[in-house]
C-alpha cells in the first residue's frame, strides 16, 4: 500500500506531537492545581506554582475555558473549575454507580444462566463493555473491558437501541451504516427495525452469531430513575451451549435481571 506523507521538513511531525502532549500535561496540571486550591486561583498563583510562563498559563486557561473546564470571575479575575469538569466526573460516577448496583445481580445471573454476564454502555455509535462476571464453565466467552461493540450487531448494542424511537434509530444507521460482520448480521434496515420492535415487546434482544460466528448473546436494557436507558446487561456463550431452544428461558432471566437493576437504580414500576 502506498503511504502518503505530508510535505514538510523531516522529523517535523514528532516535535509537533510532543508539543501537543506537553500542552495537554500542562492543562491537566492546571486543573489539578485548581482542585488542590479549593477550586479557584489567580493566574499569577497558577503560573508561579507550576513554574509556567504567565503568557503560557493564560493561553492554556483560555483553551480550557473554551471547553468549559474553567471559567473566569469577572470581578476578581480569578479562575475557577468549570461545569465541564463536573460533567466528566458525573459521567464517571454514574457509570460506577450502575456497576456497583448491578454487581450482585450480575453474579446471580451468572449462576442462574451458567454464562458470562456483561454490562455495557452506549458511547456515541458504539457500545462499550464496562463490567463483566465470567462464568465458571471451562468453555466461556469473554471480552476485555473497554471492548467496543457495534450497536446493530451485538446483544448489548441492540438492547441500547430498542428503547429508541424509529427516527433516532434511522439517524444512527445513517451515521454508521449497517456493516456486515457475519452471515447473520442484520444489514437491512426494515429487518433490523422489526427485530428491535420484537425485542421491545419481549423485553430482551438476541444476537444470534451476528457479531462473531459461534457466539450468541441475549441482552436487555437497564433504566435509571428518570426512565432513561443507562446501560445494557447481557449473557454471552458459545452457540453450541446457548442454543436457540434456550433463548426464551434465558431471555426472560436476563430481562428480569435488568428490571431488578433498574428498580435498584430508582425506576418506579408502571402504575396498573
Curated annotation (Swiss-Prot):
Positions contributing to glyoxylate binding: 154-156, 207, 217, 234-236
GO biological process: negative regulation of DNA-templated transcription
Renumbered residue ranges of the record's region Disordered: 1-20
Keywords: DNA-binding, Repressor, Transcription, Transcription regulation
Keyword Nucleus attached: no
KW Nucleotidyltransferase (keyword) present: no
Entry superkingdom: Bacteria
PROSITE patterns the UniProt entry points to: HTH_ICLR (PS51077), ICLR_ED (PS51078)
InterPro entries in UniProt: GAF-like_dom_sf, HTH_MetabolicPath_Reg, Tscrpt_reg_IclR_C, Tscrpt_reg_IclR_N, WH-like_DNA-bd_sf, WH_DNA-bd_sf
IclR-ED domain mapped to chain residues: 98-267
DNA-binding region: 43-62
Ranges of residues in domain HTH iclR-type: 21-83
One GO MF term attached to the UniProt entry: DNA-binding transcription factor activity
Cross-referenced PANTHER family: HELIX-TURN-HELIX TRANSCRIPTIONAL REGULATOR, ICLR FAMILY (PTHR30136), HTH-TYPE TRANSCRIPTIONAL REPRESSOR ALLR (PTHR30136:SF24)
UniProt function note: Negative regulator of allantoin and glyoxylate utilization operons. Binds to the gcl promoter and to the allS-allA intergenic region.
NCBIfam families listed in its UniProt record: PRK10163.1 (NF007548)
Identification of the protein by name: HTH-type transcriptional repressor AllR
Annotated source species: Salmonella typhimurium (strain LT2 / SGSC1412 / ATCC 700720)
Gene designation per UniProt: allR
Amino acid at each position: 500500500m502506498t503511504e502518503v506523507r505530508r510535505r514538510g521538513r523531516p522529523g517535523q511531525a514528532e516535535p509537533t506531537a510532543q508539543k501537543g502532549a506537553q500542552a495537554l500535561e500542562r492543562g491537566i496540571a492546571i486543573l489539578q492545581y485548581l482542585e488542590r486550591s479549593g477550586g479557584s486561583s489567580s493566574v499569577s498563583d497558577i503560573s508561579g506554582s507550576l513554574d509556567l510562563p504567565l503568557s503560557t498559563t493564560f493561553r492554556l486557561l483560555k483553551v480550557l475555558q473554551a471547553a468549559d473546564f474553567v471559567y473566569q470571575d469577572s470581578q476578581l479575575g480569578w479562575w475557577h473549575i468549570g461545569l465541564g469538569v463536573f460533567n466528566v466526573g458525573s459521567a464517571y460516577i454514574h457509570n460506577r454507580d450502575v456497576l456497583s448496583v448491578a454487581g450482585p445481580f450480575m453474579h446471580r445471573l451468572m449462576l442462574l444462566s451458567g454464562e458470562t454476564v456483561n454490562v455495557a454502555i452506549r458511547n456515541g455509535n458504539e457500545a462499550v463493555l464496562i463490567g463483566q462476571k465470567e462464568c465458571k464453565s471451562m468453555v466461556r466467552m469473554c471480552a476485555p473491558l473497554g471492548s467496543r461493540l457495534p450497536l446493530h450487531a451485538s446483544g448489548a448494542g441492540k438492547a441500547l437501541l430498542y428503547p429508541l424511537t424509529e427516527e433516532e434509530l434511522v439517524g444512527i444507521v445513517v451515521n454508521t451504516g449497517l456493516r456486515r460482520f457475519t452471515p447473520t448480521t442484520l444489514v437491512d434496515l426494515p429487518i433490523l427495525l422489526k427485530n428491535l420492535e420484537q425485542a421491545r415487546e419481549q423485553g430482551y434482544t438476541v444476537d444470534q452469531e451476528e457479531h462473531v460466528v459461534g457466539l450468541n448473546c441475549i441482552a436487555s436494557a437497564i433504566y435509571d430513575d428518570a426512565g432513561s436507558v443507562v446501560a445494557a446487561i447481557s449473557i454471552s456463550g458459545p452457540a453450541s451451549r446457548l442454543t436457540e431452544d434456550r433463548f426464551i428461558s434465558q431471555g426472560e432471566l436476563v430481562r428480569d435481571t435488568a428490571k431488578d437493576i433498574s428498580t435498584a437504580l430508582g425506576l418506579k414500576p408502571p402504575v396498573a
